[in-house]
Amino acid sequence: QDLFQLQKNANNFEGELAYSVGDDQLSTSIDLTFNFTFYGQTFDKARMATNGCLHFGLGTGNINYNDYCGDFTPDPISSQYTYTMFPFWTDLIRDNNSRMKSWGDSTKMIFGWYDMREYNRNSDNSFEVILYPNNSFEYRYDELDIINHDVIIGEVGANSTQVYQYLFHDECNTGTTNSSACVNTNWNNTSSNTLLEGG
């Protein structure tokens, strides 16, 4: 499905909020417009990470780099993080055209990463997480353009028994560790990119 595009369609989402988040950093705490239950825990706030993750339960203060997806070389999802959605975890950074935004009402809460650049490269990556009051959620994608970093899509609850890794693009010449199943193909040339990009 198409993105709601809080950046391009701001007039349709009055009161949308934008976050000036630095490289490998975490947004301020964002109030949800309804309580959201995720793996048995109910949350009323979330925080967006530049690298493409949505964290619940991190509080409102400064957070240690190791407690959110500040790591720019994602390894397979483990219990290092808890109550986290990984719509598109990779090494992303904002440029002058990039935006990280949120907007919500009683029917949905949207978190959007728009025109995010792959670190050290001129590219655009746009995707969203949408939460619903019935505690369901979805990931949506538009352009995706990554050639020098690994990519993870998934979610994690309270511990390692609640890890769901939908996709781990493990390119052999990137990242800090590589599995025996790593591939010598960049993300842009995969069927996963073809499937997700633009819908």
Give the location of each predicted region:
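Extracytoplasmic Ser/Thr/Pro-rich, glycosylation-prone low-complexity segments
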Residues: 1-199
